[in-house]
């Protein structure tokens, strides 16, 4: 696969999207807003086996302001938002052929000292929650300290936003 050919990458991601029980019924507009900016910004990982795509993830580097916007409406990110800060969020994670573990290991190795968060939705209840992930070499206590700081900054900012709809309680 040629990572320098965005159409080839797009084709591989389309194949994975269509093969995923979670993603295949989503509208094309979600594909466009969740995949195209990642390819343009080179903020994605695409795993292949025998030249066939097996797993894909994308991430956005959000500012606090855009993080709040994303949590309030996961369809709200525009291309500029993807590179607006240093708060990493997994936007898409697809591994329809059983390669979730391989993608997880790849990302922990690619970003050994980084922290990521993701919104994960329970397919049965449709309830979302924020999950946290960290690279393979970062000290867990340090990671927890930084995540707590993220939470504090987030809660401080959303307290004054009357239009914020995301629940901060479990």
UniProtKB/Swiss-Prot annotation:
This is Protein-lysine myristoyltransferase HlyC. One of its GO terms (cellular component) is cytoplasm. It is an enzyme of class 2 (transferase). It holds the Pfam family HlyC. The active site is at residue 23. Protein-lysine myristoyltransferase that catalyzes myristoylation of the protoxin (HlyA) at two internal lysine residues, thereby converting it to the active toxin. InterPro entries: RTX_toxin-activating_protC_bac. One of its GO terms (molecular function) is metal ion binding. It catalyses: tetradecanoyl-[ACP] + L-lysyl-[protein] = N(6)-tetradecanoyl-L-lysyl-[protein] + holo-[ACP] + H(+). It is found in: Cytoplasm. Monomer. Its main location: cytoplasm. Proteolytically cleaved by the protease systems ClpAP, ClpXP and FtsH, leading to its degradation. Its EC number is 2.3.1.-. The acyltransferase activity is inhibited by heme. Belongs to the RTX toxin acyltransferase family.
């Amino acid at each position: 696969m040629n990572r320098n050919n965005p159409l080839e990458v797009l084709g591989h991601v389309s194949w994975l999207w269509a093969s995923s029980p979670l993603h295949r019924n989503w509208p094309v507009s979600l594909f466009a807003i969740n995949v195209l900016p990642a390819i343009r910004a080179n903020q994605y990982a695409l795993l292949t086996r025998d030249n066939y795509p097996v797993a894909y993830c994308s991430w956005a580097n959000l500012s606090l302001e855009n993080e709040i916007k994303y949590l309030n409406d996961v369809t709200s990110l525009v291309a500029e938002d993807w590179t607006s800060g240093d708060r990493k969020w997994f936007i898409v994670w697809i591994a329809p052929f059983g390669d979730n573990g391989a993608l997880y290991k790849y990302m922990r190795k690619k970003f050994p000292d980084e922290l990521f968060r993701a919104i994960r939705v329970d397919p049965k209840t449709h309830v979302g929650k924020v999950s946290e992930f960290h690279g393979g070499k970062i000290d867990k206590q340090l990671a927890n300290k930084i995540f707590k700081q993220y939470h504090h900054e987030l809660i401080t900012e959303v307290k004054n936003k009357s239009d914020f709809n995301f629940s901060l309680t479990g």
